[in-house]
From Swiss-Prot:
The keyword Hydrolase does not apply. This is Large ribosomal subunit protein uL2. Residues 37-59, 222-262 are annotated as: Disordered. It comes from Alcanivorax borkumensis (strain ATCC 700651 / DSM 11573 / NCIMB 13689 / SK2). Residues 50-59 have a biased composition (Basic residues). NCBIfam families: rplB_bact. GO terms for molecular function: rRNA binding; structural constituent of ribosome; transferase activity.
Length: 274
């Protein structure tokens, strides 16, 4: 994997920094594991914007990823590593001994022809998935389930990982990249290793148009809008907005807590903010 800084042959190329991985498959993805992906421009079923700064972008197909890793006891061989436009991590196409193929999140260091396995009896090896109770303390893991059988939800983006700190009865303690420490049921599965493409954070798109190709629209300051569009809008010339910073809907935006479901914090041992 190489970091390539483009020559400034044009204003749009001047600040471009690319992450080039020669190990990625250069052909088409595996068709049976593709699904159509419709764009909604950040609108809900009423046509109203629920997520700002979305719209346009290149057409994509969704790759069906096996987050559950429930192919227990059947070994698989990594056929190839692929780029996935829907996530920051790379994915691996695995062919199992029974003939089925599945996409999984590719851990850092996984290569074509590597053998992987899942289940309670799987060895502690890069890319293998097994219950947390069977993983040694101090291990680096990713794609961690929060409920047994639900599929991995923690540490799925590029370069992320979780460390297994302690085991106590039916629960284990994990340390997340954010600094948070939380408990998870010991029957939850996790995959050995760190997620691939850790250099993703080093890339620079170089121009606004590259964001538009990815379906990201501009972020406009409230003070630059009209009064009908934002509480900070309007005024003669440049203005401060005239009040403490708020969202377009009038909710305070600097340190104001909006979380309502406090019950889910019972599994958090240490908050990421402390």
């Amino acid at each position: 994997m190489a970091i390539v800084k483009c020559k400034p042959t044009s204003p749009g190329r001047r600040f471009v920094v690319k992450v080039v991985n020669e190990d990625l498959h250069k052909g088409a993805p595996y068709a049976p594991l593709l699904e159509a992906k419709a764009k909604n421009g950040g609108r809900n079923n009423n046509g109203r914007i629920t997520t700002r700064h979305k719209g346009g972008g290149h057409k994509q197909k969704y790759r069906v990823i096996d987050f559950r890793r429930n192919k227990d006891g059947i070994a698989g061989v990594v056929e190839r590593l692929e780029y996935d436009p829907n996530r920051t991590a790379h994915i691996a196409l695995v062919k199992y001994l029974d003939g089925e193929r599945r996409y999984i999140l590719a851990p850092k260091g996984l290569k074509a022809e590597d053998r992987i396995q899942s289940g309670e009896d799987a060895p502690i090896k890069l890319g293998n998935a097994l219950p947390l109770r069977n993983i040694p303390l101090g291990s680096t893991i990713h794609n961690v389930e929060m409920k047994p059988g639900k599929g991995g939800q923690i540490a799925r983006s590029a370069g992320t990982s979780v460390q297994l700190l302690a085991k106590d009865g039916q629960y284990v303690t994990l340390r997340l990249r954010s600094g948070e420490m939380r408990k998870v049921h010991a029957d939850c599965k996790a995959t050995i290793g760190e997620v691939s493409n850790s250099e993703h954070s080093l890339r620079s798109l170089g121009k606004a148009g590259a964001k538009r190709w990815r379906g990201v629209r501009p972020t406009v300051r409230g003070a630059a809008m009209n009064p009908v569009d934002h509480p900070h809008g309007g005024g003669e010339g440049r203005s401060s907005g005239g009040r403490h910073p708020v969202t377009p809907w009038g909710v305070p935006t600097k340190g104001y807590k909006t979380r309502t479901n406090k019950r889910t914090t019972k599994m958090i041992v240490r908050d990421r903010r402390k």
